[in-house]
């Protein structure tokens, strides 16, 4: 038995629970939900000839011999779920005034909305993780419930994934005399387009700014009306806009996700990513595989939230949001990923 309508849940989800990580916001602005279980690249404008290399993963290893190129595939399915425990409605909520206690009906509503906030955050973390991996390496492993892990390879050129080593390592350079600008310009030549943004993790940024030449060239003045700076404003606590390095924006990203109750950084230590804010990052979604959604005519959607009571002795109430996300890059070579040393 449904408690809130899907329209009500979608409205609450969209208005209350905005989660906007850096890579999704800056690089993945196009959204394509499909009404089929599979995602068809040929149906996305401008991607008629695009195909991905997909390989099954068995016991943690990619089986390339069983892989192949495809332009249609099934995304992993995610559906975080919570139970609305009746006992929780009898306890005072953390922000409740002890002198003005709320009734159980109000608490139940608050618990439902908090559950949905947590479920939305869980899915958004998956989307951002896929987006970051696509930008960093041009491939990632997609997983889902009752879904065999599969590596999705977008075909990034080997020269676009760079690892500093030996004498080329910035850590071995003289911080007073060396200018890393030439290195950056050389790396940028591997990109298929113009580079207008560089994203560092905090440790990568600390290494970059340790050079005297960087401190002299970095323009930290605010007040620019450029489209790029406007796009980088108000990105939250996990993002810091450091200024312009020539005509390239410098951004530091310290975003995290939670895996097995442990906080982990999206960007590995000593990471530098060169890219363009006009790159075509694609948020694609397979259809919602739920009988209730089909009865309501909801097939092509990025999310399907639901709240229902399962009758029985006793009856139990649940919340859940379903999604089948797959983040893709139309051209993975628009980015150059550098592992600093």
Swiss-Prot record:
- Swiss-Prot/TrEMBL keywords: Capsid protein, Coiled coil, Host cytoplasm, Late protein, Virion
Q: Extract the InterPro entries matched here.
A: Major_capsid_GpE
Q: Which Pfam families match?
A: Phage_cap_E (PF03864)
Q: Where in the cell is it found?
A: Virion; Host cytoplasm
The principal localisation class reads virion
Task: Show the coiled coil region(s).
Answer: 109-129
Q: Name one GO cellular component term.
A: host cell cytoplasm
> Family per UniProt?
Belongs to the lambda phage major capsid protein family.
Assembly behavior:
Homomultimer.
Q: What does this protein do?
A: Assembles to form an icosahedral capsid with a T=7 symmetry. The icosahedral capsid is about 60 nm in diameter and composed of 415 major capsid proteins. The assembly is primed by the interaction between capsid assembly protease and portal dodecamer, and major capsid proteins assemble cooperatively to form the procapsid with the help of capsid scaffolding protein. Major capsid protein forms hexons and pentons of the icosahedron. Viral genomic DNA is packaged into the procapsid through the portal vertex. The packaging triggers a dramatic reconfiguration of the capsid shell.
State the protein's name: Major capsid protein
This chain's source organism reads Escherichia phage N15 (Bacteriophage N15)
